[in-house]
Curated annotation (Swiss-Prot):
It comes from Secale cereale (Rye). Belongs to the PsbJ family. The chain crosses the membrane at residues 8-28. GO terms for biological process: photosynthesis. InterPro entries: PSII_PsbJ, PSII_PsbJ_sf. It is a single-pass membrane protein. The lineage of its organism: Eukaryota, Viridiplantae, Streptophyta, Embryophyta, Tracheophyta. This is Photosystem II reaction center protein J.
Length: 40
């Protein structure tokens, strides 16, 4: 990562990463229940 000299707080990065992970998992399960993720 680039050195942001503390401009971006770690809690913000963690929050964004957490939302992204939850979103991807949600889409995966939604696709599975909809039959779109049947290939996995």
């Amino acid at each position: 990562m680039a050195d942001t000299t503390g401009r971006i707080p770690l809690w913000l990065i963690g929050t964004v990463a957490g939302i992204a992970v939850i979103g991807l998992v949600g889409v995966f399960f939604y696709g599975s229940y909809s039959g779109l993720g049947s290939s996995l």
